[in-house]
Amino acid sequence: MDIKDFRHHLHCHPELSFEEHQTAAFISERLSEMGVEHCPIAGTGILARIEGRRGNLERCVVLRADIDALPIKEMTGVDYASQSEGVMHACGHDCHAAMLYGVVKRLQMERDFEGTVLALFQPGEEQFPGGASLVLKENPFDKYKVAAVIGQHVDADMEVGEIGFCPGKFMASVDDLHFKIKGIGGYANVRSKVKDAVVAAADLILRLNMLNSDVCVVSVGNVEAKGTTNVIPERVTCDGTMRAFSEKLRQRVKDMITNIVEEIEYKHDVEVQLDVREGYPCVENDMQLTYEAMLLSDSLGYQTKDLEMRTTAEDFGYYTQLYPSLFYRLGVGRNVGRAHTATFLPDDKALEIGEEFMYRLALSILNK
């Protein structure tokens, strides 16, 4: 099976985060056909191992592709469109898995390298706590000297043939924020007997908005206050997100939010319950590894692009906290729709480029 057919099969049969049972079975079957040693990991993931013929097997490169889909009804109209109602590969994870499959296929056939390659088909990137965190809880890399963890992501802001890199800090951490504000409700015309949770919520949102900067984002996207035109509700809930570009800043912003909550309670004489649901850490690329990958991209004739830090988040950040890591972006065309929408359809022509670059990068790391 070639990588295009592999991608089309996954695209046709998408599965949500941590429900990738048929996806994992399909990947396992293809690996077994090639004689590639592999095992389940993190519930619905697959970890494959290919050993080089040159020895030094404890030295290792981990190649990672996520495999989960999104709860979106597909509207692309292609003949390999999703057959799973309301579920779609709208973030390119079908492409990621197909390219990694192609790399594994080539490595298994040739095996002319030093060390070991671990190919990780990872579940659950799209949903907290993130499949990466579950993978690491199983300690699958502990017996190896991990030289690098490599991941790539399709990018509709770049053309096919372009590969984008950002040395150092690349993607933000993400945490969900949930506020419950309790006051005393009552008639809107009797203000003296009311402790207004709506006003407190408005003040809270304005104060949170003041935390925004180039390195930190705090946003509230949902507010629920079940009052009426003349009735002030007792409770208001607010839900939002917090993103930061370092773990130190992440903790500092959490502390600042806690202080704001206390000030709102005192100022408005209400109770505010804050629940922070921790998400993914920052993605921070290894500097040397990134520069070497950029040189390789140039040498292979690709258009190497410099990327800026972005406030999107990725559970790949868990790997970057522990190992030298690189997460880069692969151009798939600018006219393919936007990620996380019903019409997103990366160009198949990008698959061979993504496979080739990841393959060459793995070999360059292991054989140097």
Predicted regions and their residues:
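Acidic/His- and Gly-rich active-site-bordering loop/insert found
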Residues: 1-89, 98-101, 105-113
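N-terminal hydrophobic/helix-forming segments and targeting peptides
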Residues: 1-14, 25, 35, 109, ...
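Divalent metal-coordination and catalytic microenvironments
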Residues: 10, 63, 93, 119, ...
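Short, small-residue-enriched loops and turns at beta-alpha junctions
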Residues: 13-18, 69-71, 127, 226-229, ...
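Non-cysteine beta-strand/loop elements that form the S-adenosyl-L-methionine
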Residues: 62-64, 73, 177, 327-333
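Histidine/acidic-residue-rich, glycine-tolerant segments that coordinate divalent metal ions
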Residues: 70-72, 77-88, 94-95, 107, ...
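Metal-dependent amide/peptide-bond hydrolase catalytic core
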Residues: 199-368
